From Swiss-Prot:
The gene is grhl2. One of its GO terms (biological process) is bicellular tight junction assembly. GO terms for molecular function: DNA-binding transcription factor activity; intronic transcription regulatory region sequence-specific DNA binding; sequence-specific DNA binding. It is found in: Nucleus; Membrane. It comes from the Eukaryota. The keyword Nucleus applies. This is Grainyhead-like protein 2 homolog. Keywords: Activator, DNA-binding, Membrane, Nucleus, Transcription, Transcription regulation. Belongs to the grh/CP2 family. Grainyhead subfamily. Residues 86-108, 125-147, 423-444 are annotated as: Disordered. The keyword DNA-binding applies. GO terms for cellular component: cell-cell junction; membrane; nucleus.
Length: 619
């Protein structure tokens, strides 16, 4: 019995009357303690303290760590439950004989456990004089029972009223006696002396949730602290020069004053576009730095929306396939390592996300000529623009945070290089004439002639920033393909709930018979009503022709049933397998728009009593 008593130590907590410094404001006691004890107490830390002779200091701090690991609601237990659960008579003997636990908690039904921040935490050792121990223990009663020095450890703590928060335990009045809280310490004893002032200086104290916002008051950018949730963070940039875009293509030598840069491109050739951030906070790594950019090919600003749609529809009607796009991107590894979430949101636009902390690069090609928008020969080509809109990824707004453009003229068969050479020859002729005129003026006494400024050849074209961010760009989506784009989630209506990452895509609602140039050939209209498929089994060498009366799944099932004698009601699944090995459910859109006159291998698989599964593998 004596051995068990020696192994059990007691901790007495005595609240102090000292007023806590009002500058130190915490929102809760748990948050304040975590600001002191934010690093885990590892075995290596305990070993280092043991080497320095602080074995019991480590044990005391470990007690605090264990205490604050328990959720707060589980620590605030009623005193009656604690009194019923404690059967150890040695612990009760530490209380004065004339005072019981029930008297100790008069006017209060909760145990006050390490209330708020223990600023002056002192743990006495075996060498502390008995007079000092009696000074602390007399706060419990006028006639306390003596306790061995090795069995009692006294903890002194200050308490204060947290700012912006009512205290969870009533504070004692002026004439009220200080209360003591007893803890049982069974595994270790503490005999070293420590103070919390060693961990935090008065001049350097700050609240646990203090931030560095004060140091960025003068900047235009707005950043939230790291404690802000991902959904609440808004990457805001107000400076117009925040982003910089470059096109790796030769710039025209004949740049017009007041207009954007002009670049010559070849149709079908891929060019690299580099996107980067050049704001004032370039040196800082933003915690949430994803943005969404949309690269699009549009007409100049002098063309209104109806005119642009008229030109696009005329161009689309002259293409050899309805799938032909205005703008395509290359699947280069160099590009896909810097961008993500690529979406072909329109025939003339591509959307993707990228990290402003890193430089992004994407390779694009333009599939239309500047002369493709008129049926007349010898007409000067229309200038086009490559426009880049960048949106804040988390800000659900259809207004970009940055917009820039570059004018382009698209040629065929290396026409861009020939155009540059022609401009170089013209410039050299002007240079020769200018030098001759300058020499004549120098011969005269007072004749002066300013030299004509000459443009230098540049293989990099910088985009020009646009100040108008309110005008919505015109995105071209043919009506015949809108249903398929909507099914795949690439088109969103103009509503507040259907804006993703700040990118707004509008459906171009136009009557089918509206005149946007020459009408499409009648063969294309008739071909959309009937679909012809060439199908053979894997063991066959000759294809069978399946003529679908209706371009739907039902029409396909009826054609298969008629050709191969399989009842329609027995076919439970029908799939299409692409050349890349992608297996998809066959639907009406695939049959109507993407399967006419295609060749397939038919595979019929029996599913026991359920029916048949049919797979059409594209070849």
């Amino acid at each position: 019995m004596s051995q068990e008593t020696d192994n059990k130590r007691l901790v007495v907590l005595v609240p102090n009357d000292a007023v806590f410094n009002p500058r130190r404001a915490y929102t809760s006691e748990d948050e304040a303690w975590k600001s002191y004890l934010e690093n885990p107490l590892t075995a290596a830390t305990k070993a280092m303290m043991s080497i320095n002779g602080d074995e019991e200091s480590a044990a005391a701090i470990g007690l605090l760590y264990d205490y604050y690991k328990v959720p707060r609601e589980k620590r605030l237990l009623s005193l009656n439950k604690i009194n019923e659960g404690h059967e150890d008579q040695d612990k009760r003997n530490c209380l004065p004989a004339n005072e019981t636990p029930s008297n100790l908690s008069t006017g209060e039904n909760r145990v006050q456990v390490l209330k708020t921040v223990p600023v002056n935490l002192s743990l006495n050792n075996d060498t502390v004089e008995s007079s000092n121990r009696e000074k602390y223990t007399t706060s419990l009663s006028e006639s306390p029972q003596p306790a061995p020095a090795s069995a009692v450890t006294v903890v002194k703590a200050e308490e204060f009223t947290p700012v912006f928060m009512a205290p969870s335990v009533p504070y004692r009045s002026d004439g009220e006696e200080p209360r003591g809280v007893i803890f049982e310490q069974t595994h270790f004893g503490v005999h070293s002396i420590t103070t919390h002032s060693d961990y935090l200086k008065d001049d350097q104290r700050s609240t646990p949730d203090s931030t560095y916002n004060e140091s960025f008051k003068e900047t235009t950018e707005k950043y939230r602290t790291p404690s802000v949730g991902t959904e609440e963070f808004l990457y805001e940039q107000t400076a117009s020069s925040t982003f910089q875009y470059t096109l790796e293509a030769t710039k025209s030598l004949r740049q017009k004053q007041g207009e954007g840069p002009m670049t010559y491109l070849n149709k079908g050739q891929f060019y690299a576009i580099t996107l980067s951030e050049t704001g004032a906070n370039k040196c800082f790594r933003h915690p949430i730095s994803k943005v969404r950019s949309v690269i699009m090919v549009v007409f100049s600003e002098d063309k209104n929306r109806d005119e642009q749609l008229k030109y696009w529809k005329y161009w689309h009607s002259r293409q050899h396939t309805a799938k032909q796009r205005v703008l395509d991107i290359a699947d280069y590894k160099e590009s896909f390592n810097t961008i993500g979430n690529i979406e072909e949101i329109a025939y003339n636009a591509v959307s993707f996300t990228w990290d402003v902390n890193e430089e992004a690069k994407i390779f694009i090609t333009v599939n239309c000529l500047s002369t493709d928008f008129s049926s007349q020969k010898g007409v000067k080509g229309l200038p086009l623009m490559i426009q880049i809109d960048t949106y804040s990824y988390n800000n659900r707004s259809n207004k970009p945070i940055h917009r820039a453009y570059c004018q382009i003229k698209v040629f065929c068969d290396k026409g861009a290089e020939r155009k540059i050479r022609d401009e170089e020859r013209k410039q050299n002729r002007k240079k020769g004439k200018s030098q001759a005129a300058q020499a004549q003026c120098n011969n005269s006494a007072d004749g002066k002639l300013s030299a004509v400024p000459l443009q230098k050849k540049s293989d990099i074209t910088f985009f020009k920033t646009m100040t108008d961010l309110d005008v919505q760009p015109v995105l071209f989506i043919p009506d015949v393909h809108f249903g398929n784009l909507q099914r795949t989630g690439q088109v969103f209506y103009n509503t507040d709930d259907d804006i993703e990452g700040g990118v707004l895509v509008k459906r171009l609602l136009r009557p089918v018979d509206e005149d946007y140039g020459p009408p499409a050939p009648k063969q294309m209209k008739e071909g959309s009503r009937k679909v012809l498929l060439y199908v053979r089994k894997e063991t066959d060498e000759v294809f069978d022709a399946l003529m679908l009366k209706y371009p739907t799944v039902k029409g396909l099932l009826e054609a298969i049933s008629e050709k191969y004698g399989i009842p329609v009601e027995k076919i439970v699944k029908i799939y299409k397998k692409s050349k890349k090995g992608i297996l998809v459910n066959m639907d009406d859109n695939i049959i109507e728009h993407y399967s006419n006159e295609d060749t397939f291998i038919l595979n019929v698989e029996s599913l026991a009593e359920q029916g048949y599964k049919i797979t059409l593998t594209e070849i």
